[in-house]
Amino acid sequence: MALKCHLVLLAITLLLAQCSGSVDKKDSTTNHLDEKKTDSTEAHIVQETDALKENSYLGAEEESKEEDKKRSAAPQQPGLWGKRQKIGLWGRSADAGQPGLWGKRQSPGLWGRSADAGQPGLWGKRQNPGLWGRSADAGQPGLWGKRQNPGLWGRSADAGQPGLWGKRQNPGLWGRSADARQPGLWGKREIYALWGGKRQNPGLWGRSADPGQPGLWGKRELVGLWGGKRQNPGLWGRSAEAGQPGLWGKRQKIGLWGRSADPLQPGLWGKRQNPGLWGRSADPQQPGLWGKRQNPGLWGRSADPQQPGLWGKRQNPGLWGRSADPQQPGLWGKRQNPGLWGRSADPQQPGLWGKSPGLWGRSADPQQPGLWGKRQNPGFWGRSADPQQPGLWGKRQNPGLWGRSADPQQPGLWGKRQNPGLWGRSADPQQPGLWGKRQNPGLWGRSADPQQPGLWGKRQNPGLWGRSAGSGQLGLWGKRQSRIGLWGRSAEPPQFEDLEDLKKKSAIPQPKGQ
């Protein structure tokens, strides 16, 4: 019985062992398959990773090469320019491959040199040349305004229409004729201009565009604000008629200033019968410079040999001049109440001055020498009339827009003392240099802060032009944050080796045949 039980247990044990072996085998097979699968997956992943890495390396290498290429071709950014990416109105190219002065790179601006070696020279716009410049096209050299519609002033861009002019079809305010048949200086050809001669109706001033009417003049038929006329010569000009040469005011009633239009009445003068404010006598019997003959005017030489010299009025000396009275020589304004500027007409009160004392001058009082504005309340500019307050200044208590401090404790040039104006030197030795406003620096100046030296526009938000107020942002620029403003030098230091290297690399190629 015991043996039988033992055999049963042995059989059960063998059976269990067999089952266990089968399971282990299956597990082993499964594990093996899993391991194979895992190994295969891992190998695939590794392979893909290696491929990705290789591609990444290749891409990085290509990108690095591309960056190196870009960097090598990138602008060194030396010199003056407008904007770096979108070239501004004027400057030097920030791209060593496009040197020279220009306006915009793609659409050249109003003035500059061509940024394209194939279009050198000065110009306005490349396709539509601007108001002034040289032709960017070697086939259209010279100075001009616009190429198709020449602008206000320039040389013809067309070799067939040389010279200086305003507009080609409708000549502008001033220039030379673009038509070789109509040389000379003029304003507009058909329409009356504010300044310049016209062909049909000559303007206020210019040369005749008609060889038959040479010379300088104002209007031909209608007197203008300034210039000579043919029939009724204006205030000043040369005769447009060869028979009446010279400078003059009006022909029949000589104007304020000019030369006689009559060869028998040469010289500079004001009016012929009643000499004007200033000029030479048109009468050989009354030579010299003067104002009025009987009642000498504001300034001039006496028309009377017995009353020589420069003066204003004889009895009541005017604003400035020399005394017409040998007993009262010198330059002055008024004798008793000195005018705005002059020398004392009184030997006891020599020197230059204005009023007792006026806006500017030297003291007429030997006890108060020097240049100044007003004695009690110094004006906008001058030297102190008080030896205790020497120097140039604006106002003593509230310094004006420009001057030197009248206070030895606040020397230097400045605008206003408490709130420095647009331009000046600091009136405070602790804030030296040139600047705009002290607290909020203006459009241009030197930093009043030793920690922010240099020229700049605004300190916090640099304006259109200046030097960096920060030692880390050297050079000339427009705006500090974008750094590449409308005009300036790179805020980065130049990258040329030396001046010769700079000249060599930034030289403007000369067009062939020039």
Swiss-Prot record:
Region spans: Disordered: 23-180, 258-475, 489-514
Signal peptide (UniProt feature, chain positions): 1-22
Gene Ontology biological-process entries: neuropeptide signaling pathway
Subcellular location, principal: secreted
Compositionally biased intervals (Basic and acidic residues): 23-53
Propeptide: 23-75, 93-97, 114-118, 135-139, 156-160, 177-181, 190-199, 208-212, 221-230, 239-243, 260-264, 281-284, 302-305, 323-326, 344-347, 356-366, 376-387, 405-408, 426-429, 447-450, 468-472, 490-514
Keywords, ordered alphabetically: Amidation, Cleavage on pair of basic residues, Neuropeptide, Repeat, Secreted, Signal
Record InterPro entries: Collagen_Structural_Proteins (IPR050938)
Record-listed Tryptophan amide modification sites: 81, 90, 102, 111, 123, 132, 144, 153, 165, 174, 186, 205, 217, 236, 248, 257, 269, 278, 290, 299, 311, 320, 332, 341, 353, 372, 393, 402, 414, 423, 435, 444, 456, 465, 477, 487
Subcellular location: Secreted
Purpose of the protein: Metamorphosin A may be part of an internal signaling system involved in control of metamorphosis.
Name assigned to this protein: LWamide neuropeptides
